[in-house]
Amino acid sequence: MKPAYFISDLHLSEKHPELTALLLRFLRSSAAGQARAVYILGDLFDFWVGDDEVSELNTSVAREIRKLSDKGVAVFFVRGNRDFLIGQDFCRQAGMTLLPDYSVLDLFGCKTLICHGDTLCTDDRAYQRFRKIVHRKRLQKLFLMLPLKWRTRLATKIRRVSKMEKQVKPADIMDVNAAFTARQVRAFGAERLIHGHTHREHIHHENGFTRIVLGDWHNDYASILRVDGDGAVFVPLEKY
């Protein structure tokens, strides 16, 4: 049976064209073209200020995802903490299906819960408070009404502050809370969880389920999770 592929945390930006080149290479590969589905679990872009922003980066990525979708490969997207403002307009342009924060898939007979992963990091209370605020629909609507230049400037400032705060936060609070994560998996009746966000690529076997953490992409290393009837395995992008 055709495999499914999972990626997250590419953090594409015009400052790092090499990462965009890696993604385009994968999307154009024969492996991607023969997949049953490709799942992008958030933070595809380093930041997103609205679907109305037109750039060479956004356009080229949407174009290549659309080409893959037009081949009959289903492409799904879950918003991340950096690109949570991606909306239906961009997803339609790219031929992607926008999924909610949590979704349960039947992958080759294994009930699998997928999400970006930031909602699982409940020990980082400051971030969870911030997330609750910026996910308010009314606030998002007001933000998207601002001129594009203002939105970009504000997003840049928020990113700068976030980066500074991250440098002084204890590493453990930026990982998932094990007890909360286990409860979520049980609540959805899943046997396996796939998420990104923490950048700690690993396959864990814990609390009666499998937890797979997707890694982030760098110019010297990027991996893709391949899931098929034999299980799940990380494959270096260089093999595609």
UniProtKB/Swiss-Prot annotation:
Residues that coordinate or bind substrate: 81-82, 124, 162, 166, 169, 197
InterPro entries membership: Calcineurin-like_PHP_ApaH (IPR004843), LpxH-like (IPR043461), Metallo-depent_PP-like (IPR029052), UDP-diacylglucosamine_Hdrlase (IPR010138)
Gene Ontology MF, one: manganese ion binding
Keyword Lipid biosynthesis: yes
Cofactor(s) recorded in Swiss-Prot or TrEMBL: Mn(2+)
GO CC annotation terms, alphabetical: cytoplasm; extrinsic component of plasma membrane
Source domain of life: Bacteria
Principal cellular location given in the protein's record: membrane
Protein name: UDP-2,3-diacylglucosamine hydrolase
Protein's organism: Neisseria meningitidis serogroup C / serotype 2a (strain ATCC 700532 / DSM 15464 / FAM18)
